[in-house]
């Protein structure tokens, strides 16, 4: 063994002598004096634990792989000595199995199972090796410590080289290898040499393979991001392996996976998203199947194919099954085409229906770009016979047709409810969507088929689901698509929820023909009890030119195994976009569990993948989650949600969101009635369309535990000279006893007029006006955003998140309403969104309805008006109520248009309100690119009477206006807080941003005012918040703005934190003028105890060419005098570049530019940082300020913090406690820490050329420097005069 180690040393030593040897060298002197007899005997070491301790990290310059050895060398030289040099060699080989040649090529090392360390000293031709007392190499395990005894005589006139050699394999456990070398001798002063090699920490996560796991949250959220700026290749794998053995209780399997790839030019990508369900054991109360989406876009001459398949368990007993769902078909032809579509749902035709969910949601969409005519009727026929108790019937259908020129289309969507037979608590069918668009001379065909189970007993199973297919051809193409759901054909069906949601959309941009049929066949035989079948799949493909695509989405229901009360699968999305002549293929497959015992378990998780390619590259990615493979898992919730965003830097843009709302557990006894309606019409030229979508709820009888109605969407687009009208009305039940009801929901209206058209639309939700309503949750939330600057069309999604479990108390009233209107030329639009809160009666523990969205777009000479109104229940007692929420208004005028809009929320004005959170946030956006005028008012009226206890008052309001040319706009956002009554423990109002942009010769003014409560008793109140004003003038414009927060002026205020932070930013690139005032008025009356006054304000303006600017930011703090002193450097003459040069990171200028006293010896200090050497923010993982009373995160990928725009130049305000040094106060030391090229960084182009370290700290201080003034810190301490 001694001979072997000698060979190791000789080989390494010989390697050192080569001129081409790549080693890591550092020459460090003067850190340790061993008090040896003469000057030349001073031992120079790079490591020490003495007063001048210096720690370094041994870097790895190679990737770890099997059968490799890597060596790190650190040379320590005493330059004051001459003569015969010796070498101290310390080599360490970790506990790794390998057979790697580590010396001469002819010599091969034996497999290592220990760390081997030896010391060799050479004087010319003589080499002495030192190890342990028996002359064998010293061994230890990873994380162990080796002690070497080195004779004193070995120190004289030696040059010492420390060599750290490492064997590696494909797997090295999580560890930090600490190698300690203690030079024992007769000399009185010794040192400890510590090598803390944190970069040697390699990790690989393996799932537990045995043991018992209880109440475990498995898996989770994984993100993979890769960015290639040019001709690159990337691959990523995220794997989810479900448990394959053992007993799992209360598990929900599968989850949500997203894959996104973007190629701006001539690229190819392929991606596979696969979820493997557990393959062994018995599964009880499991959620199987799920939701799959596939999207592919080809802008030129490409071909794509995609298959989305869900394989359900193929046999066994399934009980409590919900079948059927929603189906959508969309086809688009740009010119001179004809299309027809029929969406039909055939419900079961015989028997008695009990506890059925009736009706639902219907949508009709038609688009005519030129001289066309279309008509559409969507009719929901409620059940006409039998006994119906707690029934939710029907579902959601949408029909969309678009004709850009001289076409004709007609469509009928009919839902036939069950008229007879015995059906108990069953949800049948599922949801499918088919969309096809042909941009040029292409052909596509797609089939979406759901095959329900054909035999056996099914108990409490959720099967089927939702499938979507989308294909786009811009010219002269043909497409056909069939979406068919075949329900189980045998057995008895009990407790069935029938039908679901179907959507049909067809668009013809050019001389094409398309036909589509969406048919749902309900089950005609067999025994199905409370079963939810299948899941949701979506497929989207777009071809802008001469391409061909085909896609098949198939769901195979379970044919084997015993499954009881099982909800299978989850949600999967795949999106790929190709802007030029590429090819892509993708397969999304969900394999359901085929064996094993799984009981009420939620596994899986949430995965996101994002890739961006600005130029001709190739990428492939696989997202896979590996779940635990053995053990017992009880009551585990995993899963999650996924979001998708993709941007094309050239010739294309795409975006998308994948959201999964998992059930949250518990017992759900309330029934959800009805569903969602959508209406879309688009007329690009000289066309006319009309459509009516009406849902008639049951008007008589006894309905118990019912959730009524849902979400509606109306979209109309007129590119030229067309007219359209549409009404979407939901009539809630007007009679009977309703208990534990979730009422209504979310409504959206969208209209687009590119030229000289007129449209009107009304979306009204009438809440129940009579009866007793107890423990009611009212539907959900909608957000819609659309901007059309040319002859394009955009639409948004309506998402309703219903509660899934538990008993709901302490009610939240109303919700969120966005309004968007866009008029690109000579148009006029007006819109009103009003929410009327309950004004009287007895309402107990009620959560009232939801969210309404209105969108209108006018590209040319059009007019539109729309009203979205939500009428809350007007009678009853309201106790422990949280009152509504947020309203948004957006209007855009590209040319000579006028628009006005009012968004008003009227809170309850009478009755007893206890523990109420009032209102929320309201954004307003208006854009006028040329010669236009717009005005908007957003007002929130808080409750003005009654007793309010423990109330959180309103929230945030935003106003945005943009004027590209010669326009004028004004806007007022006002929040009126309650003016009477008793208010205790109240948080008042919130944050208000104001943004206005005028690129040419325009004028804009805006006022944002928050009026706090002016009377009553206020105790333990946090007042108001943050206000922002932003104005940008690209040319010859003028703007002024005032943001004022008026705090309460009367009453008793105790333990109050007043106001907050206000930013003001104005930019004038040419010959402009701007002025702005931000003022916070602190309460001037009452008792104020333990109060922190005001907050942070800043004013920034940039004038690149001869302009004028003025700005005032005034913060009036209660009773505290204003005091600010200019800070100065305590030791300005030291050399602060010395430390960064030696440690190899960029030099920087670090200053404290201002301080403001806060009282009690606390100060706000503003730090300014600049450096000439930096990478961009895309290469930054984290930036923070350390060493103060708290850590200040300026940027963090993992924590989602981004408070800087340029990593090389920024300012930040921190709070510090001053240190008194006589006549002035000094700031404590602090550090600035940079971490590059690690967490979240996917584009390594800058990292690969960066000449400095990837992680380093800047240090401040005046207490560590040598006789030449070379400082071991990077900036001076800063002090200021005592104020």
UniProtKB/Swiss-Prot annotation:
A GO-annotated cellular component: cell surface
Main location: other
Domain Flo11, residue spans: 1118-1283
Composition skew (Low complexity), residue ranges: 107-132
Family annotation (Pfam families): Flo11 (PF10182)
Presence of keyword Metal-binding: no
Region (26 X 35 AA approximate tandem repeats): 211-1120
Sequence repeats: 211-245, 246-280, 281-315, 316-350, 351-385, 386-420, 421-455, 456-490, 491-525, 526-560, 561-595, 596-630, 631-665, 666-700, 701-735, 736-770, 771-805, 806-840, 841-875, 876-910, 911-945, 946-980, 981-1015, 1016-1050, 1051-1085, 1086-1120
Summary of the function given for this chain in its UniProt record: May be involved in agglutination during conjugation or other aspects of colony formation. Induces flocculation when overexpressed.
Name of this chain's protein: Putative cell agglutination protein pfl5
The species this protein was found in: Schizosaccharomyces pombe (strain 972 / ATCC 24843)
Lineage, broadest ranks: Eukaryota, Fungi, Dikarya, Ascomycota, Taphrinomycotina
Gene designation: pfl5
